[in-house]
Amino acid sequence: RVRRVDEWVDLRERSKEDREKRATTGESDYVDRSEILLPDRQSAELAAAARRLNPAAVGTIPMEYVDDTIGFNPEWIVDKISPRPILFITSEDDRLVLPEESEQLYAHAGEPKKLVILKGYGHYEVYSEPAFSEVMGETLEWYGEYL
C-alpha cells in the first residue's frame, strides 16, 4: 500500500531469494527494519531518537518477516475468534496502521469485543506516557472482565 510497484516487485524478489536460502541453509538474511516496515515521519523520528538513546538496540529484522506478513490477512480469521473476547486498541493519529483498519476488523469480529480509539497519538506514542497508561487501563479493565 505504501510502496511503488517497482519497489514491491523488488521486495517480492528478495523475499523469494531469501525463502530459497532458508530452504537450503535454515537461515534468513537480516535487513534494516525500515526496508520492510516503512515508517511514517513520526515513527522514523521516534526510532531515531530511541537509537540515539540506545545505540546497541537491534534495528534489523529477518527477510522471513516478508513472507509471514504477506501470507497473513487478519480479515480472514477475525470472525472465527468469537466467542473468545477481543480488544482492539488503535490511535487516532496512527499513520502506519490506520484506525479504519482496526474499525474494519472490529466490525467483522464477533462478541465479546471492544474498540478503543486513543485520541491524539501516533502509532508508537502508545508505548510511552501518557498514552501507555491509557492503554494499560483499558487492557487491565478488559482482562479483569474476561480472564
Where are these regions (language model features)?
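Conserved beta-strand scaffold positions in the cores of enzyme catalytic domains, especially
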Residues: 115-117
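C-terminal alpha-helix
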Residues: 138-146
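Short beta-strand/loop motif that positions the catalytic acidic residue
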Residues: 81-82, 87-90, 94
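Short, conserved loop/helix-junction motifs that constitute active-site signature segments
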Residues: 79-82, 107-110
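Active-site nucleophile elbow and catalytic-triad environment of alpha/beta-hydrolase enzymes
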Residues: 61-78
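Conserved alpha/beta-hydrolase "acid-adjacent" motif
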Residues: 95-101
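Alpha/beta-hydrolase-fold enzymes
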Residues: 1-51
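Catalytic histidine-centered segment of alpha/beta-hydrolase-like enzymes
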Residues: 121-134
